[in-house]
Curated annotation (Swiss-Prot):
Protein name as annotated: CRISPR system Cms endoribonuclease Csm3
Assigned keywords, A-Z: Antiviral defense, Endonuclease, Hydrolase, Nuclease, RNA-binding
Catalytic class of the enzyme: hydrolase
Gene name for this UniProt entry: csm3
Enzyme Commission designation: 3.1.-.-
Native source organism of the sequence: Enterococcus italicus (strain DSM 15952 / CCUG 50447 / LMG 22039 / TP 1.5)
């Protein structure tokens, strides 16, 4: 029974979020590390690859890594079936498709009403232990209180593994909520919260009414 299940919700930003947008030229006086933005709207986004990568990393550590493991293709089978494998001769498609999360319309309206900026500039400073020379820099962060719309597609490939897969998705989300997303997490950045609005079958006839991840 091949089906697709869609998970829709919000990602709430609890502390300033920094996911860098590479490839931008920094001018004199410009922010040293800007956040990644949607080229169309110019609003901050959370790349699906960032969400997926952090979920995979945390879940793999939680389930247990192979001693001496150096490659993600050596993850446990339950990780590989959710997130995929690119190993030559054993390529495995990911059951999860995590889209970019876009700045929500509700957040735009709330921020505009309160005259709040969508992003903020955080000043950081490192000092060389050898020379005592300071190296100040400016980091752009998505402002606390922002909310992003997200959706995930889960491909049902084996009905006997759906419940276990959703338990692992639930665990990965819980781990991420108690860790951080993006850069500077040890300095307070990147605390987020998932709010699940709906889980429904959009292709096929798999009964998703009993599924939950929160």
């Amino acid at each position: 029974m091949y089906s697709k299940i869609r998970i829709v919700g919000k990602i709430d930003v609890l502390t300033g979020l920094h996911i860098g947008g590479g490839g931008e030229t920094s001018m004199i006086g410009a922010i040293d590390s800007p956040v990644v933005r949607d080229p169309y709207s110019r609003l901050p986004i959370i790349p699906g690859s960032s969400i997926k990568g952090k979920m995979r990393s945390l879940l793999a550590k939680h389930i247990g890594l192979i001693p001496g493991q150096k490659m993600h293709n050596q993850d446990a089978p339950e990780i590989l079936r959710l997130f995929g494998s690119s190993q030559k001769g054993a390529i495995q498609s990911s059951r999860l498709q995590i889209s970019d999360a876009f700045f929500s319309k509700a957040s735009q309206e709330e921020f505009d009403k309160k005259d709040l900026a969508y992003t903020e500039t955080k000043f950081e400073n490192t000092i060389s232990r050898l020379t005592a020379v300071a190296n100040p820099r400016q980091i752009e962060r998505v402002t606390r209180g922002a909310s992003f719309d997200f959706h995930i597609i889960y491909n049902v490939e084996n009905i006997n593994e759906v419940m276990a897969d959703f338990e692992n998705i639930k665990t990965a989300i819980h781990l991420l909520e108690n860790d951080y997303l993006g850069g500077g997490g040890t300095r307070g950045n990147g605390r987020i919260r998932f709010v699940i609005d709906s889980i429904d079958t959009v292709v096929g006839d798999f009964d998703s009414s009993n599924l939950s991840i929160k």
